[in-house]
Amino acid sequence: MRKTIAYFHLPGLFEAYAFYRVFLPLFFEHREYFYDWCAIGSLHGAPADCIWGGGRVGSGEWSAQEVLALTRAYGLSARLTFSNSLLRPEHLSDGRCNALCRAFARSDGPQNGVIVHSDLLLDYLKANYPQLSFISSTTKVLTNFRQLRQELERADFSAVVPDFRLNKAFDDLRALPQPLKDKTEFLCNECCSFGCRERRACYEAVSRKNLGEQAEHICTAPGASAGYRFSSAMENPGFLSVGAIRNVYLPMGFSNFKLEGRGLGSAMLLEFLLYYLTKPAYRLRVREAIYLDAMLDLF
């Protein structure tokens, strides 16, 4: 079933809250600046000091009440990124993480959710916060399509984010029944080396760091020392371009697309949204509305 709207799931719910306070009014009040086939489905992230966190170390000191008020105002779902893969039973009673889940579960408006890796945590959340939806994290590094399909078939999850190396498995993707296509949420802008064999180890190091354990991990994959560069992500074999989303994935029946980058700065986040959401003729206007004025000095 061909889809007509691409729903983007954006990074930085807590980490880039100040940015979204400016960007979201612009997006919803000036829809002529943005592609009419694009919509925002959710914002995801986690504040600092969350032991359930994973994927990236969370940041941002904004309260749950502040971020939820923002997402409610624009009819968006808010997702907690709680994808720590190394949780133990004693971690489930953590007061900070439970308080966040309570706030998200009780919030009015669209259903909020949790991005999760650990089945231990998933079972706990299902029992204690059934109002939330649950999204299977890409940190599981499911690079075998059979594994991905099994994950999509799990009734526990409203969405599954595949490993980016399955983004171009077109024959298998086309063969999915529509209900499973509707649950598939592609990671569009991954910069990690396509052939990296350390991805799982990298995520585990972040999980340990969130637990307060020493877990320094130096990635040796090609290009890792340069950090995240959007230009490099665009050259990645797993990259999903605007043209591919509109002309390949929507016609195939897929409609959910995730952007990574909650640990990056707001300047990089803006570049993502200019590329994926904004019509080229209006990109300068969006920059001017966000930060650009005649007195700005770069050096």
Predicted regions and their residues:
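Active-site pocket-lining/capping segments in soluble small-molecule metabolic enzymes
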Residues: 1-147, 151, 157-299
